[in-house]
A protein has these predicted regions:
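Bacterial N-terminal signal peptides
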Residues: 8-16
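A residue-level marker of the well-folded mature domains of exported/periplasmic proteins
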Residues: 21-363
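Positively charged n-region of N-terminal signal peptides that target proteins for export
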Residues: 1-9
Length: 363
């Protein structure tokens, strides 16, 4: 009887040990992913990529972002809450480049790796951002300028002081690094193309509008070509639509040749103001104006397919999310990490169904 009891006790202890060990093994590293939002299709694709990486690398993640990309303080609170959960690493897409500096100093002091995604944090404390997973936004927007220039070059060359022309760049805000880079990339590339490939020069160009997008070396005295940098009153859809409508109201008077919308929100604003883009072709006032968008979504894809837009720039949001979590995991494991360019491509009605493009343009 005693022998049987000893055996039973031993079995119970062994079973408890096994269960305890399994419990320990099942505890996964936790990575906090703090996004700029979840409201746009773009962020849903980023989230899918992040979740896939979490599955592949055996980590638990939370993915959260504020209701609107103007809710900077809400994002800061989300980051604070995530830090309180003791993550092994953090992936961050900062809405405002200066709003999270204190938190980044804390993570650096605590040795918590932070990976930037979608946009960087230029003023971040040195060493606090371990790597970034993002599109080269400056180059991607430069691609948009090149595509637009091909179509409007002749009309630019015809510009005069008596009849100047205007190119409009619509940016959702003037604080996010990704949008700032896009606006500046389009601006600089268009200036370079006009200066090098037409009879005009930089002295004929003026960059006007939101001062965050006017560099110290931007031409501001020209009177033949105006590049206007527009930022809506807020990131709200109504403000994006109102800003787009204000531009459309001046197409004839300002001789606007083209509009570049630098993200999905500004695209949606323009589409809302033009009956999903149909007015851009049905109204003779807009028919010769060139529009290029950014990212995708069902409505934007439809505008490209129907040639309301010349085309759009697509990123790879799935890879942005995936690489953000992958880099965060590798940093936690002590591996060396570096910036990853997740790429961008121009798509139009002719190539949007090609295999290398189709998988990037989400609905």
């Amino acid at each position: 009887m005693k022998k049987t009891l000893v055996v039973l006790v031993a079995l119970v202890v062994l079973a408890s040990t096994v269960l305890f060990a399994e419990g320990v093994q099942e505890k996964k590293p936790y990575i906090a992913v703090v996004s700029k939002g979840e409201q746009h299709d773009f962020w849903q694709q980023v989230k899918l990529g992040a979740n896939a990486a979490a599955e592949d690398f055996g980590v638990d993640i939370t993915f959260e972002g504020p209701p609107s990309e103007s809710d900077v303080q809400i994002q800061v609170e989300m980051l604070n809450n995530a830090m309180a959960k003791n993550p092994v690493a953090i992936a961050l897409a900062a809405l405002n480049t200066s709003s999270v500096l204190d938190q980044l100093q804390q993570t650096k002091n605590q040795g918590i790796p932070v990976i930037g995604f979608d946009s960087g944090v230029p003023e971040a404390p040195e060493g606090s951002i371990w790597a970034n997973a993002s599109t080269n936004n400056y180059a991607a927007a430069g691609m948009a300028a090149e595509k637009m220039f091909e179509v409007i070059k002749g009309r630019i060359e015809s510009a005069s002081i008596a009849k100047p022309v205007k190119i409009v760049v619509m940016n959702q805000d003037a604080s996010g690094e990704s949008l700032l880079s896009r606006g500046k990339g389009f601006r600089d590339t268009m200036i370079k193309l006009i200066d090098e490939k037409t009879a005009l020069s930089k002295s004929d160009i003026s960059v006007i509008g939101n001062t965050a997008y006017i560099a110290s070396d931007s031409p501001t005295k020209g009177r033949k070509v105006f590049i206007e940098m527009i930022v809506p009153a807020s990131a709200a859809m109504t403000d994006a639509t109102n800003a787009a409508q204000a531009v459309l109201n001046k197409v004839s008077s300002d001789n606007i040749l083209g509009i570049f919308c630098s993200n999905e929100a500004t695209v949606k604003g323009l589409l809302a103001a033009t009956n999903d883009g149909a007015t851009l072709k049905s109204n003779a006032t807009f028919r010769d104006m060139v529009v290029i968008g950014y990212d995708a979504g069902a409505a934007q894809k439809n505008a490209v397919r129907n040639q309301y837009f010349l085309g759009s720039i697509t990123q790879d949001p799935y890879q942005i999310g995936y690489k953000a979590v992958e880099l965060a995991y590798k940093a936690y494991k002590g591996e060396s990490v570096s910036d990853v360019d997740t790429g961008a491509k121009f798509y139009n009605y002719q190539n949007m169904d090609d295999p290398d493009i189709k998988g990037l343009i989400y609905d």
